[in-house]
Structures are given as structure tokens and as C-alpha cells.
Amino acid sequence: MIIANVIRSFSLTLLIFAALLFRPAAAEEFSASFKGTDIQEFINTVSKNLNKTVIIDPSVRGTITVRSYDMLNEEQYYQFFLSVLDVYGFAVINMNNGVLKVVRSKDAKTAAVPVASDAAPGIGDEVVTRVVPLTNVAARDLAPLLRQLNDNAGVGSVVHYEPSNVLLMTGRAAVIKRLLTIVERVDNAGDRSVVTVPLSWASAADVVKLVTELNKDTSKSALPGSMVANVVADERTNAVLVSGEPNSRQRIIAMIKQLDRQQATQGNTKVIYLKYAKASDLVEVLTGISSTMQSEKQAAKPVAALDKNIIIKAHGQTNALIVTAAPDVMNDLERVIAQLDIRRPQVLVEAIIAEVQDADGLNLGIQWANKNAGMTQFTNSGLPISTAIAGANQYNKDGTVSSSLASALSSFNGIAAGFYQGNWAMLLTALSSSTKNDILATPSIVTLDNMEATFNVGQEVPVLTGSQTTSGDNIFNTVERKTVGIKLKVKPQINEGDSVLLEIEQEVSSVADAASSTSSDLGATFNTRTVNNAVLVGSGETVVVGGLLDKSVSDTADKVPLLGDIPVIGALFRSTSKKVSKRNLMLFIRPTVIRDRDEYRQASSGQYTAFNDAQSKQRGKENNDAMLNQDLLEIYPRQDTAAFRQVSAAIDAFNLGGNL
């Protein structure tokens, strides 16, 4: 019993001793606080604590300061060591033989950096190199993006090897791990399914051509195959095959469905009715541009697919165009026709021609004759004394009037008095003339933009242009008729805004009065005032296009030498003629742009109101209704509204109202 107790006590003691002997030692912890410590001393301290051999590059210099309030285990202490060196621009290279090498970060990428793998990726700030193969993304396209996320100025580096489509990434293990995550998400195979899109109306080949053309910008961006949708035409079934990334594929399918629509017209011929333009005028324009359109379309097609000629005809009765063309050319022509078939603005051109003529003349002469000594004769008197004496002798002889005297008297104007006694004769002629001529014309005309318009009010005057006497003493005269009156020819061009360029030809002509003209057997004399010019004026503005202020003084004296110069008595031996004429001529013009029906109606109503007011003042209100049949002009009824009065006031400013 005693022996058994002793054995039991001895066994318990052995168990306690064994437990104490084989108890694991407590993990060693390190302090991580350094202040102003030389970096090499810091490296030596860590090397000693971790029991690692460290080789320090001679370029490693400096001091460090770091503070930690926690105790770190061996692994934490090593990562702390790597992080501190990283902050100060140094890196640690693990030589895989228990030796560590401390170098500058920029030199680490060319050192013997260990190649990491999925099994040994590295931890924290360890410098590692990783080889990453890519399957769906081009390495040359992804490398620039990854470089922006890596520390390229320090230990980081990202390069690509295009033949194998791999990335070579060097850097801190934590950074490389983040870059790997990005690569895995980007290098996605995607969905490469093929979708067949049947077509009901369009041609598969034409649709593929259009889609490919529209998709050129996407292709030029050099995206990988998974990001770009591909389209192929199946002409056998008239369908389009689409493959690619789902989003791109859906975008292409939606585009194809928009193109596959029924045409508005059947066949290639269409009748287009015009609203404003003249069909015959558009045919020449459209024929010219359609040949260019067809050349551009056919240049992109194979020879077997060339279109037929484009045919454009005009139907005058309905003012319509009949167009035969391919659908694509037809659409282009319709757009051009829509832009040409617009309501063109018009221009109301109003002109004022104001002319005042005033002429005064005085002819006075005395002629003497002596039967034996001779005579003084002045032809500017209109009646030579020799003709008068010969006629008087003829009359005294047989009581008849000679033809020469009759002709002279018929063409003479004024007074002629004298005596014929014995051998002496005297003839006094006198003529005073006064001519006044006032012209006020206010022509107006409306025309389309860029269309020439002519306004002509006058009469045709016969003019002798030739005379011929035949063998039978018959006289044949050739007569032409010359139009005299008021002519206005204008071509307006509306520029940007409301300015109008006017090409003007204006003429005011009349037949000169017999008393003031030099007419003879050659025919009448015409007074002509013409203006040909171009002016730029704003709509509604008045501009002077021409003017003339003319004064003419003519003083003629025919006299007997010496005797005609004697004061007072000399008047008996001379003939004088004096004429003073004045002429004032001004031409004004005012264009008004008319863009719509309301403006046209307003302008027409204003003209009618001004005309009616002028006639009322001239003939009296009681006769006005009898002169103008209101039933015929009910489209322009007289109204005393503000709108009509506003137009009338504008025209009154142009001197139309009451001065016709």
C-alpha cells in the first residue's frame, strides 16, 4: 500500500515536470518606435531582431522617425520594416535564400525581384513581379491604363509582350494584387452569340453597307473583338447576321429595324405637286444635280447593281413634277424640292419722278431796207425783211401773196410791224415766250425676289425715219413709232435682313413743244431723262436715285457794225434774243419687302385707299362711288381702321395722296 502511494506520487511529479518542460515559448514581440534614427541603424536593428541577413546598398542614406504604441509580432514587424523603407524611397528584395537586399525603389524593378504566383502572391509592400496572360483584351491597349494605377516613378512597372498577349507587372505586392483584380474584370470573354435579323422590305446587302458605314467610327477605335458587333448579309434569305457584345449587338439590331421599313410609294416613280415654284423651272435645276447624285451613288456600287437613268418631267396643267429614280436618289431629290418650293418674298417698289421746268424768252429786232442802197437783215427774227419786201411788191403788182411770204408768215410767231414808203422800208419783230412744265409721276410695281419687272405708261409717237420718191413722183415715207412716257424697269434682290439691292432702269420721255423745239422736216424732238443704276436700300426706306438742277441763260445779239453800238439809237440797228430756262428734276425710290399674305394685303389696301382718297378730292365725294364700283373691288373695301390709316399715312409721306 505504501509502495503504491509512492509510485503514484512519483508519476504525478513526472507528468508535471514534463508539462513544464514541453510548454511552447511565448511569441516574441517588438517595439516599433524610432526617432531621428539613422536608416542604416534602423535596418541593422530590424535585421538583428528578425535574425535575417541584410545587404544595404551604399546609396541608402538618411534618418527615419516613426512611432507605434503597439507591440508587433514578427510578421507585423517585417511588414512594418518594408512599409517604412517604402515611405522613404527604398525597397527590399528577397533573394529567396534568407538574404534581404535594400536598394532604392527606382532600382528595384531591374533587380532580382522574385516572380509571384497565385500560390505565393507576396504580402504587403514586398516587391514582386507578376506575369498575367490575357485572353480577350489586347495587352497593348490595357497596359497604358494599368501604368496610370501603378507607381511608375518608383518600383512599379507595367510592360506588355504583344506576341503572347501577356502583361509583365512589377511593384508592391498589394498594388499588384489590386491590378490583377482589375485585369480579371476587364478580360471578360463576353457573349459572342449570333442573332439572325430577317428583313421584310430592305435589301440585306444595302442594309449591311449602311450599318458598316455608320459603324466606322466604332471600328476605328481599335476595340477588341468582343466589343464590336459584326454584321454579315445573307442574301439567300435576305437576312442580316449580327454578332458581338450584347449592348453593341442590340444597338445594331435596333438600327437594322429602323432601316427595314416600307417605302411610302410603290415603284420608283413619284408625282410631286408644287405649292409655289414653277414645275418647268425646277426641271432644269433638278436634272443638273440628279446626274451628280447618280454618279456618287453608282461609284459605291458594283457594276451589276447600277441604277437606271433618272427621269424628271414637268406637268404644266397641275404644276407637278414626275420623278423616276432609285429610292435613295428619290429621297435626296425630295429634300431638294422641299427646299426650293418655298414662298418667295415680294418687293413693292414705289417711285416719285418730280420735274419742274420754267423758261422765259424775249426776241426783239428792227430791220431796214433801201431800194437803192441795200438793207440790214437778221435771220434770228424769224421773218427776213427781204421776204417781206418781195411779198409786198408782188401784192402791189397783181394782188396776190407770194408763196415765200406765206411760208415765212406761217412759221413766224409774235408781232411784225413796219412801213414801206418810196425807197425805204422798216420791219419791227417782237416775241415774248414763257414756258412752264410740271411733271409729277408716282409709278409703283410689285415683283418677286430676283425677278425683273417693267412698268410702262405712255404713248407711241410716229417718227419719220426715211423717205423715197419713185419714178412716178410718188413719195413713200418710212415711219417708226417711238414710245414716250414713263418707264420703270426694276430687279430687286433681298439680302440678309431687310436690305434690298435694286437694279433700276428708269426713263421719263416726252415730245418737246413746237414753240421750244428745233423740230423740222426731220421729225419731232423728244425730251428724255434716263437713270440706270443699282442701289442698296433698307425695306421701307426712301433713297434718291438721281437728280438734276439745271439753269440755262442764252443772250444773242445781231447788229450792224458801229451803228448797233450807238447808245439808244443803236437799238434801231440790231436784233436781240434772250432766253432763260430752269429745270429741276428729282427721282426717288422706295422698296418695301412683302413676306406674307398679311403684308401683301396691307400694302395693296394702302395703295387702293390712297388712290380712292385722291379721286375723292378731285371729283368730290358724291361722284366717287359712281366712278369706282365697290362690288368689283370689295376685296379692298374702304375702312377707317387704324391699320388702313397707318398704311395711308406712310404713303402720304411719299406724296401719293392728293397729289396725283
Swiss-Prot record:
Residues 191-264 are annotated as: N2. Residues 28-124 are annotated as: N0. One of its GO terms (biological process) is protein secretion by the type II secretion system. Residues 346-596 are annotated as: Secretin. Gene3D superfamilies: 3.30.1370.120. It is found in: Cell outer membrane. The keyword Membrane applies. GO terms for molecular function: identical protein binding. GO terms for cellular component: cell outer membrane; type II protein secretion system complex. Residues 1-27 form the signal peptide. Involved in a type II secretion system (T2SS, formerly general secretion pathway, GSP) for the export of proteins. Required for the translocation of pullulanase. This subunit forms the outer membrane channel. This is Secretin PulD. It comes from Klebsiella pneumoniae. The lineage of its organism: Bacteria, Pseudomonadati, Pseudomonadota, Gammaproteobacteria, Enterobacterales.
